[in-house]
């Protein structure tokens, strides 16, 4: 986050050290027309939803090149995201755990609300996901969410959500995909 990056920068530079601190990230994966879509889909599942999306290097934006690739990618992602088993760490079959705090859960669900309000297509909605085991209903669980037709002026594109939300931004050619990065 930006406050943490400022803290690291201030602390480091106050001792005369050179510091470079990146406080936020929107990591993109470009999927070209000749890509192996099964491989790309599997890579996206781990990169976007591993650690409940709460890691600095999570892929939060998929950039398929051409609408044909975008449509096929979304079609492959939907059943995989819907099948994610969400649960506590004591459930060995759980594929994704809870978010870290209730405040963060509210932040992530707020971004999903914003995405819908700004006109992105919510293809998979993870907001009402229940955990895999009884007794954990008060945890901060959220399932994977997938947006399509996201544009670079939307808050879900511009801001780091730091949660299990994947945005699909369609590009018509390689150069326009690279321009997004």
List each model region and its residues.
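Short, solvent-exposed loop/beta-turn-alpha elements that line the ligand-binding surface or hinge
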Residues: 157
């Amino acid at each position: 986050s930006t406050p943490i990056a400022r803290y690291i920068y201030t602390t480091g530079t106050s001792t005369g050290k050179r510091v470079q601190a990146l406080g936020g990230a929107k990591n993109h994966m470009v999927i070209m027309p000749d890509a192996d879509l099964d491989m790309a889909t599997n890579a996206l599942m781990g990169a976007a939803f591993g650690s409940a999306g709460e890691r600095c290097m999570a892929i939060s934006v998929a950039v398929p090149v051409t609408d044909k690739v975008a449509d096929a990618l979304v079609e492959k992602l939907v059943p995989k995201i819907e099948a994610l088993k969400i649960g506590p760490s004591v459930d060995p079959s759980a594929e994704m755990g809870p978010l870290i705090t209730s405040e963060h859960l509210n932040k992530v669900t707020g971004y999903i609300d914003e995405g819908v309000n700004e006109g992105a297509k919510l293809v998979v909605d993870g907001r009402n996901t229940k955990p895999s085991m009884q007794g954990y209903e008060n945890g901060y669980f959220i399932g994977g969410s997938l947006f399509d037709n996201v544009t670079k002026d939307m808050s879900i594109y511009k801001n780091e959500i730091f949660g299990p939300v994947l945005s699909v931004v369609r590009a018509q050619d390689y150069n326009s995909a690279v321009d997004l990065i």
